[in-house]
Amino acid sequence: ADESDVAKRTNIAPTSKLKLMLTDISVVFSIYLVQFIILFSYLFFVLKIPFGDNLQIIILTALLGGLVNIMLGYSIALIFKAKAISIISFGGVIASFLSGMQFVGMKYLVEQHLPLLAYINPAALITDNFYITYYYNDLSRAYLNLGILGLMAVLIGTYCVYRMKGVSYDSL
């Protein structure tokens, strides 16, 4: 990630690392937002898929989930550099599997035997919120999941800023 000439110039620029990171994240999130609007509009207006009565929670879950995953990708790229794409892909498949997206029973196995994993897996929080908003009237767990996703975004973002401050190039 930061081995390229562009990354080296960016890292030694007199711009704060926080501004650089916020710019990167904003651009990627803007692209995600456009994609989300197109997909959601297609599912809702063209295919007429019912999303339940809590559209605002579904939309907020999708947006916060997207932000957390963008931040996770950013942090993994900072840590692993050359192997980041492979690790992100593998991590996404594992997180999705553990959230029950390939095998419904897995979600319940994880919740019974590794409950902490169910609360730190973004895919599990997102799928759980979609399930909760469609089937239940009590949204307290959905709000908890949104809070956890928000906290994850802040913590991962803080880590990224901290990690970027340590990057320097003595010999260019």
Give short role names for the model-derived ranges.
Residues 1-13:
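Transmembrane helix boundary and interhelical loop/hinge segments in multi-pass membrane proteins
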Residues 12-18, 139:
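Juxtamembrane helix-boundary/capping and inter-helix hinge elements in multi-pass membrane proteins
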Residues 16-24, 45-56, 81:
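Short juxtamembrane and helix-loop transition motifs at transmembrane-helix boundaries
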Residues 17-43, 63, 150:
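Selective transmembrane-helix segments that form parts of the transport pathway or gating/packing helices
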Residues 43-45, 76-77:
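Hydrophobic alpha-helical transmembrane segments
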Residues 50-172:
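Membrane-spanning alpha-helical segments of multipass transporters and channels
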